Amino acid sequence: MPYSSLHPSIPQPRGLRAQVAALVLLGACLVALWGLGELPEYTLRWLVLHLASQQIGLLVKGLCSLAEELCHVHSRYQSSYWRAARACLGCPIRCGALLLLSCYFYFSIRDKAGLPLPWMLALLGLSQALNILLGLQHLAPAEVSAICEKRNFNVAHGLAWSYYIGYLRLILPGLRARIQAYNQRHKNVLGGIGNHRLHILFPLDCGVPDDLSVADPNIRFLHELPQQSADRAGIKGRVYTNSIYELLENGQPAGVCVLGYATPLQTLFAMSQDGRAGFSREDRLEQAKLFCRTLEDILADAPEAQNNCRLIVYQEPTEGGSFSLSQEILRHLRQEEREVTMGSAETSVVPTSSTLSQEPELLISGMEQPLPLRSDIF
């Protein structure tokens, strides 16, 4: 399933454009240095000195961070000082190698530059102290967002996995059996194409009313599917249920489907309304989009979700625009009908004249008894 197929506003994963821009910058700087006419040895000397200063400065910054982490070594690092040091300074082998190389080039080039050692060390300490106290090297919001997405630190990532493991993975495997049981008692109400799926509504503004008729009066509650129960987290016979809704168009019934909102969106909305969460409306919109994308990725690889659910992602227009939720759902239902019809047309095999003109062949197996026609007996 391609990215942003559900809604055009859902962002794609970040690529390598920052590295490409850095490569272009590298080429431009090399051309500029070549145009200035400086000797390569002179440029290399100061470049190595600058890189060595950066590495020593990062070591000083890590030591300052270690002073704080040592106060939490028992609660955060299971009483392991080694883990606390690695969290602040990184891999010891890499850190030691960079430190040795940096010190070697730093002290050898410093002598040629004629700069006193105490002055340069004091300058390094001063610069790092100002960076920490004044926050001069804070990450940009885009960098923080990229790190959180890459390391799966987002609120949306946890909500998507919780929704899948705690709900969808439990109800989707038995959904078709429950729909069949419902159809037997209600004259095949859900017998249409696409009606065997769970349709999950995803409003990107996270506005999730408890009653769907409040969102659109053309959505009318019809029945409940047969309940499903399971022992879950110490709760015996926990009940899971799904609702069936009838969709009206021009006052007449136009469709029936199993429908419901993605409940974690209520959590995102409540967080944006509670000042203690520190969650702005912009954060809510970003996390809602990432939640939808993450859930889409999860369901794409989940065998129990294949053809059993459909995500309906929409964003209501601002004031002055017209939007009908019932029409959006009907559009998806009709699209499902077209997809199923086209799929069945492609899979149907029409025998060609050359095939029909061949002489019939008898395929005789070496087994003494004929095999049954049903393969699921084995």
Swiss-Prot record:
Tissue specificity is: Expressed at higher level in the spleen, lymph node, lung and bone marrow, followed by the small intestine, heart, liver and brain, and to a lesser extent in the stomach and kidney.
Give the GO terms filed under biological process for this record: activation of innate immune response; autophagosome assembly; cGAS/STING signaling pathway; defense response to virus; innate immune response; positive regulation of interferon-beta production; positive regulation of macroautophagy; positive regulation of type I interferon production
Instruction: Write out the ranges of the annotated region (Cyclic dinucleotide-binding domain (CBD)).
Output: 153-339
Task: Kindly list the places in or outside the cell where this protein is found, as annotated in its UniProt entry.
Answer: Endoplasmic reticulum membrane; Cytoplasm, Perinuclear region; Endoplasmic reticulum-Golgi intermediate compartment membrane; Golgi apparatus membrane
Q: Where is this cross-link: Glycyl lysine isopeptide (Lys-Gly) (interchain with G-Cter in ubiquitin)?
A: K150, K236
Side of membrane Lumenal, spans: 35-44, 107-116
Its post-translational modification remark reads: Phosphorylation by TBK1 leads to activation and production of IFN-beta. Following cyclic nucleotide (c-di-GMP or cGAMP)-binding, activation and translocation from the endoplasmic reticulum, STING1 is phosphorylated by TBK1 at Ser-365 in the pLxIS motif. The phosphorylated pLxIS motif constitutes an IRF3-binding motif, leading to recruitment of the transcription factor IRF3 to induce type-I interferons and other cytokines. Phosphorylated on tyrosine residues upon MHC-II aggregation. Dephosphorylation by PPP6C leads to inactivation and decreased production of IFN-beta.
MF terms in GO: 2',3'-cyclic GMP-AMP binding; cyclic-di-GMP binding; protein homodimerization activity; proton channel activity; signaling adaptor activity
Q: Sites of the modification Phosphothreonine?
A: T355
What coarse category fits the chief subcellular location reported for this protein? endoplasmic reticulum
Which positions are annotated as binding 3',3'-c-di-GMP?
S162, Y167, R238, V239, Y240, T241, T263
Q: How does it sit in the membrane?
A: Multi-pass membrane protein
Q: Membrane side Cytoplasmic: which residues?
A: 1-17, 70-91, 135-378
Q: Where does 2',3'-cGAMP bind?
A: S162, Y167, R238, T263
Using the record's annotations, give every residue carrying the modification Phosphoserine: S354, S357, S365
Q: What does this protein do?
A: Facilitator of innate immune signaling that acts as a sensor of cytosolic DNA from bacteria and viruses and promotes the production of type I interferon (IFN-alpha and IFN-beta). Innate immune response is triggered in response to non-CpG double-stranded DNA from viruses and bacteria delivered to the cytoplasm. Acts by binding cyclic dinucleotides: recognizes and binds cyclic di-GMP (c-di-GMP), a second messenger produced by bacteria, cyclic UMP-AMP (2',3'-cUAMP), and cyclic GMP-AMP (cGAMP), a messenger produced by CGAS in response to DNA virus in the cytosol.
Q: Could you give the domain comment from the record?
A: In absence of cGAMP, the transmembrane and cytoplasmic regions interact to form an integrated, domain-swapped dimeric assembly. In absence of cyclic nucleotide (c-di-GMP or cGAMP), the protein is autoinhibited by an intramolecular interaction between the cyclic dinucleotide-binding domain (CBD) and the C-terminal tail (CTT). Following cGAMP-binding, the cyclic dinucleotide-binding domain (CBD) is closed, leading to a 180 degrees rotation of the CBD domain relative to the transmembrane domain.
What is known about its subunit structure? Homodimer; forms a homodimer in absence of cyclic nucleotide (c-di-GMP or cGAMP); 'Lys-63'-linked ubiquitination at Lys-150 is required for homodimerization. Homotetramer; in presence of cyclic nucleotide (c-di-GMP or cGAMP), forms tetramers and higher-order oligomers through side-by-side packing. Interacts (when phosphorylated) with IRF3; following activation and phosphorylation on the pLxIS motif by TBK1, recruits IRF3. Interacts with DDX58/RIG-I, MAVS and SSR2. Interacts with RNF5 and TRIM56. Interacts with TBK1; when homodimer, leading to subsequent production of IFN-beta. (Microbial infection) Interacts with African swine fever virus/ASFV protein A528R; this interaction mediates STING1 degradation.
Name recorded for this polypeptide = Stimulator of interferon genes protein
**Species:** Sus scrofa (Pig)
Q: What is the lineage of its organism?
A: Eukaryota, Metazoa, Chordata, Craniata, Vertebrata
